[in-house]
Amino acid sequence: MSDKLIRAIAKDGMIRIFATETTELVNEASKIHDCTPTAAAALGRMLTAGTMMGAMLKSDKEVVTLQINGGGMAKGVTVTAYSDCSVKGYIGNPHVDLPLNTENGKLNVGEAIGKNGGLTVIKDLGLKDPYVGQVPIYSGEIAEDLAYYFTASEQIPSAVALGVLVDRDHSIKKAGGFIIQLLPGADELLGDLLTYRLDEIPSLTTMLSEGKTIEEVIEFIFDGMDLKILEEETPKYKCDCSREKVERALLSIGYKDLKELYDEGKEEELKCHFCNKAYKFTKEDIGKLLEEKEKSIADEVSEEMKKAEEKEKNKK
C-alpha cells in the first residue's frame, strides 16, 4: 500500500483535517540516515508532521521548516516541507538507542528528544521576513508538542497524532499521522465530542497495522459528522541539494576559513545533511571559490568607497 495524504473537512467545514500514511517515506529516510529504531521513530514523526504542514501551504513558493531540540541524546531533529507534499529531514544523532518507555512499552522518543528546549516552526511565505513561531517543549513526544504549538502560537485548537511502528529488522512497519483542527466559529461541544472520540479509538499505527487505509481511519473517527474528503496526494521524501548549493554554502563562510581550506591543499568532502550525498572539492575547486570570494569582497569595498565619496560630495 503506497503512501497517501488526504485533506478533508467535517461538520459543515468547522473541522479541518490533514491525515497521512508515510510508511514508505519514513522507511526511505531511516535507510538514508542509518537510524536506530528510536531515531527512526523521532525522525519519522517529524517528517510525518512536516508532510501535513507542507500541505497547509498556499503556494509552491512557500516552505515550512520544523525544528525540535530538547537537549536529549537525539541532538535535535530538523525537517523542511513543501506544498507539493515533499519533505526532507535529518536527526542530529541517528544512532541514539534507548530502552523502551517503561510506562507504555513504546520507543522512548520523549527521552531521546528531551524537554529542555523548544519546538520552532519557520514559515517562508515569500515575504521579506519569514514567520517564526516557537514554544517550549511540552513532552518531547512531538505530537503533543505540535498540538501545543498550534494552540499557543497560531491560536488554532488542534489534535495531533503521529506514529511510527518499527519492525524487528528495523524497517518501518507503519507510519502516519493526522492533524485535526477546530476552525473559528466551531461549537465548544464539537470540541468535547472530538476529544471523546479520539480518547476512545486505538492508536493510529494500530489501525494502520490492522489493514485500515488512512481514509478508513478518518471515516471511522468522523462517522456521522458529514466528512468530505477534498483532495488526495502522494507524500514523498525528496532532497533538492546540488553542487551549486554546496558551493554557495562554502562561499558563505568567512574568507579566512576558506583560505585555510585552500592552504591545507586537501580534497574536501562535504555531505548533505538531508540525503548524505557527498560532494568532493579539490584544491583547484576551492581556489576558484576563493577567487570568487576575493572578487566579491573587492566589489563590496569598491561600492562602499563610492558611497563614501558620494556622501562627501553631497556635504560640499
UniProtKB/Swiss-Prot annotation:
Residue pairs linked by disulfide bridges in the UniProt entry: C239-C241, C272-C275
Transmembrane portions of the chain: none
Locations listed in the record: Cytoplasm
Coiled-coil region list: none
GO MF annotations in UniProt: protein folding chaperone; unfolded protein binding
InterPro entries found in the cross-reference section: Heat_shock_Hsp33, Heat_shock_Hsp33_C, Heat_shock_Hsp33_N
Matches recorded under Gene3D superfamilies: Hsp33 domain, HSP33 redox switch-like
Cytoplasm among keywords: yes
Keyword Membrane: no
Described function: Redox regulated molecular chaperone. Protects both thermally unfolding and oxidatively damaged proteins from irreversible aggregation. Plays an important role in the bacterial defense system toward oxidative stress.
Protein name: 33 kDa chaperonin
The species this protein was found in: Clostridium perfringens (strain SM101 / Type A)
